[in-house]
């Protein structure tokens, strides 16, 4: 298993420590279900994919079964032929990827579900800027709720994320100190936008593309 630059994935996985988050971009088909995820996690754990056991927590978030869940944390997302997998130690990452497309009712969705400051920032943009900004904002909010382990049911209006062209940042979170959080926009190619979030100190992000689908 290698990256598009020819690096050995097992060698990269062996270098994961508490200062970095590994992010993997790969081709994906829905019929594969969780098999690519298990294959990659197996490289980190030194296990064959069929020995990697995943379970869903009380909010439906996938995690490794004990005892592996104490050693390795991950999150993943897929959209329109691409998947992103974030792997870390000691923190719970949240990641989201979305295909770039025009959403005609973007402002209506924002007004109904988003924080008022986010809606105001989107409204201030011209239409061409708004389309991409909405999708980047959406992935940022998805990444945060996934890092919270709660999903959209947490309430998208209960926190506020910066709107592009401003740098990605969690500005406010109900019941928590937003400054304790990290939020980053990721480069997922011309056809997708993506974001990564976690609660905790800043870490470096190392991102690779797999040379072939798992």
Task: Describe each model-derived feature in a short phrase.
Residues 1-214:
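Core catalytic alpha/beta fold that binds nucleotide/phospho-ligands
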